[in-house]
Amino acid sequence: MLNKIFYIIMGPPGSGKGTQSQRLAHQLKLPHMSSGELFRSAIDSASPLGIKAAEYINQGLLVPDAIVWGMVQEALNQPECQSGCIIDGFPRTLDQAILLNDFFMQSYADYRVIQLDVSNEEIIRRIHSRFICPSCKHVYNQNQGLSECPTCQMKLVRRSDDTLEVIHKRLESYEKLTAPLIDYYQELGKLTRIPSEASPDDVFQSIEACIKA
């Protein structure tokens, strides 16, 4: 596991983590590991961890860190991650961040954290105007004027949790649980903050400059 390098893409909901993670994965030819996709895959395949996670989700409870970390660790140990990967949506709590840092230290793997900074006003505007392809999960903005995914020809839909009420709750949860990670990674010297209210192309150029520095 020597010579690995991982990039953790962080930011509030609607900051563009998924979009920028996918672009960075393509650019660096590294796998893109989305915690959301890990959850969906584990639950859909009824894996042991997926079954346990579903039990909590179905009761409206938070999935314990031990189960979440089990899924992530399993993914990180896959052969395709032997040269590193782009991590999107994890960690979400300080305890998860400590588990991940310990894993990297024990694996002699290097990692960097990129924080996408976006104001709450911009986040609300973005999320309230976005649509997704139910097949490939690509995100589109209503200003693009598309009704179907150009790649999959599937009708674009709005995520059921992209309502103003849910958006505010997600932002509150982020501020409480995930924002403290910024200080943690800053103290470790792992963090780079990227202003991310510009166009996706401009933000990606900033990310490229960051990883080349």
UniProtKB/Swiss-Prot annotation:
Q: What class of enzyme is it?
A: transferase
Task: Write down the Pfam families for this protein, in alphabetical order.
Answer: ADK
Q: Which GO cellular component term is one of those annotated? A: cytoplasm
UniProt: Zn(2+) binding residues: C133, C136, C149, C152
Q: Write down the EC number.
A: 2.7.4.3
Q: Which reaction does it catalyse?
A: AMP + ATP = 2 ADP
**Which InterPro entries does the entry link to?**
Adenyl_kin_sub, Adenylat/UMP-CMP_kin, Adenylat_kinase_CS, P-loop_NTPase
Q: Where is this region: NMP?
A: 34-63
The ranges of region (LID) come to: 129-162
* Residues noted as binding AMP in the record, renumbered to the chain: S35, R40, L61, L62, V63, G89, F90, P91, R92, Q96, R159, R170
Q: What is this protein called?
A: Adenylate kinase
Organism field: Chlamydia abortus (strain DSM 27085 / S26/3) (Chlamydophila abortus)
This chain is encoded by the gene named adk
